[in-house]
Amino acid sequence: MSDNRQTPSGELSYYGLSLLSYLHDSHPLLAADTSFIADRADRAAEAYSDAIRAGSTHAEAEAAASDELYRRLHFSPYNTLVHILWDEFAAEVPEEAARAVALRLLALPVFRDVLAKYDLTDDFAATPEYSQLYTELVGTVQILLEDGLQ
């Protein structure tokens, strides 16, 4: 596999920058994982090249690269928690603080344990298990808020 991780000047590639931007918005705990970002960027570039060599159009090759770049990242526990805080705990957590609170919550072992029970596939939000996860997360947030987390 070629080294498409960084440009000669040491900057991230197009795919690396695209993924980094997405991670900042949807998976902030992964945004500092440079190995993960570089590996995914390499795989996306390879998928693009393979598709072009196989006769795919630019649009088809770009779709193949995007599939590889964002695989298993479409569902965001972070964004789910942010929306739970906005929708269920607006009185307890100000809207402008929800993102920071969600980030703190995701770092707690209790949240990692809840999330580990589910197969968080790209289409997880469309599954029946999503409702169960949502309920568990609401309950966990409620308990933590009652115990003084703010």
Please provide the spans of the model-predicted regions:
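C-terminal alpha-helical interaction appendages
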Residues: 2-150
